[in-house]
């Protein structure tokens, strides 16, 4: 068995570095969890004036294996490289993990790279059903499938939802074709969701959308009742499937304005969706944790007791970046991508859309599909 510990300022009650160092001296195998942000503070690698002895000892310790999760983040700076160089001793094995390693690939030889992606995952999922002649394999268009706990052999990939990407041209959904970016002459989310600001704007108008009528028309279009529509809230079946969605918008002011506008629409007044705004200007561990707790509470998930009432609630989470990487919100079944363009960084886009591909089972029903509603078709096709 392994002993585990975290950095001293962690409040989880786990052992600290010195506890597991003593365990290691006594022949016990140990695991130590520490954040890159914590180690980057050390003066040893050029960080802030932090002479913490613990940080020095962690960096100087002779580790057998160092695993860097989300290795595409914060490791390519001078401080990040300094941390890695200090941890990497002669004989230390290094494992870099990333779902979007685009900025790392040129630093490794081909034989050093192991790739397991969504396409392989879904291929193995289908192949397993074919090899085992699984007649119960899901062929239903439904987003949730019943779980059969009496199956003799269970597909090990069955909990991993298939992703569907649907594209729409927002400018054609409303009369927004005339709303164009001044520099490019093309439609842009930033202009569409532009918020009135400045001292020359009447106080009662500040914080409202400049093109409020068009934004409101867009929201109404999303939930306009229609049997053959593919908009996420256009019929009762879709509304049940998309109880909990993530909407990615251009910025903080835009998220604030959209929350106020949504709360005036039938999505909130009749369908009882609760809007949770987690958009913020900064992203540290504490703020991300607070935002996650805020979302889970609104959804009806209690982390302490493990209770899950997400099938009884409805939420829309608004973000301009927060909770779009390294976070799991299992009840999310769709993301509405309402920012950026075809030049959006691939890593940003992929990290965001795969927030909704997390496994989720509740009351015997398992999420078998998840959706991306992308309102910039050029992005999804490039």
Task: Name each model feature, range by range.
Residues 33-38, 97-101, 251, 319-323, ...:
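A short beta-strand-to-loop transition that corresponds to the Sensor-1 phosphate-sensing loop
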Residues 1-36, 43, 48, 52-58, ...:
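Conserved C-terminal RecA-like helicase domain
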Residues 38, 54-96, 100:
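SF2 helicase catalytic motif II
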Residues 277-382:
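Conserved RecA-like P-loop NTPase helicase motor core
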Residues 73-75, 103-104, 344, 359:
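Catalytic P-loop NTPase motifs of RecA-like helicase/translocase cores
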Residues 62-63, 89-93, 160-163, 271-273, ...:
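Short glycine-/polar-rich loops that comprise or flank the Walker A/P-loop
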Residues 106-246, 259:
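Interdomain helical connector at the RecA1-RecA2 junction of SF1/SF2 helicase-like NTPases
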Residues 41-47, 70-83, 328-330, 348:
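Conserved ATPase-coupling elements of RecA-like P-loop NTPase cores
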């Amino acid at each position: 068995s392994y002993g585990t510990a975290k950095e001293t300022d962690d409040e989880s009650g786990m052992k600290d570095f010195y506890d597991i160092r003593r365990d290691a001296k006594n022949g016990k195998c140990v695991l130590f969890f520490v954040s890159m942000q914590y180690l980057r503070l050390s003066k040893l690698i050029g960080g802030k004036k932090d002479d913490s002895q613990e940080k020095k000892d962690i960096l100087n310790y002779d580790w057998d294996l160092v695993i860097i999760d989300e290795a595409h983040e914060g490791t390519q700076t001078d401080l990040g490289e300094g941390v890695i160089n200090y941890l990497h001793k002669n004989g230390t094995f290094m494992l870099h993990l990333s779902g979007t390693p685009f900025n790392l690939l040129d630093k490794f030889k081909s034989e050093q790279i192991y790739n397991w992606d969504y396409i392989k995952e879904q291929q193995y999922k289908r192949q397993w059903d074919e090899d085992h002649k699984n007649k119960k394999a899901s062929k239903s268009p439904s987003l949730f499938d019943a779980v059969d706990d009496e199956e003799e052999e269970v597909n090990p990939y069955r909990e991993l939802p298939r992703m569907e990407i649907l594209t729409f041209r927002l400018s054609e959904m409303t009369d927004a074709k005339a709303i164009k970016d001044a520099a490019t002459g093309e439609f842009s989310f930033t202009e569409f969701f532009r918020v009135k600001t400045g001292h020359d704007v009447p106080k009662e108008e500040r914080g409202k959308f400049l093109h409020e009528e068009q934004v409101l028309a867009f929201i109404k279009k999303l939930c306009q009742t229609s049997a053959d529509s593919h908009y996420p809230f256009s019929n009762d079946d879709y509304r049940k499937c998309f109880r909990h969605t993530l909407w990615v918008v251009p910025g903080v002011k835009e998220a604030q304005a959209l929350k106020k506008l949504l709360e005036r629409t039938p999505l909130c007044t009749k369908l009882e969706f609760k809007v949770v705004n987690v958009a913020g200007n900064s992203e540290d561990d504490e703020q991300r944790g607070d935002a996650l707790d805020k979302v889970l509470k609104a959804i009806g998930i209690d982390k302490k007791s493990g209770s899950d009432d997400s099938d009884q609630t409805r939420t829309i989470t608004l973000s301009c970046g927060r909770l779009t990487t390294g976070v799991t919100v299992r009840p999310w079944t769709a993301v509405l991508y309402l920012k950026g363009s075809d030049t959006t960084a691939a890593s940003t886009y992929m990290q965001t859309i795969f927030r909704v591909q997390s496994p989720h089972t509740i009351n015997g029903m398992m999420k078998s599909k998840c959706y991306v509603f992308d309102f910039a078709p050029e992005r999804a096709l490039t």
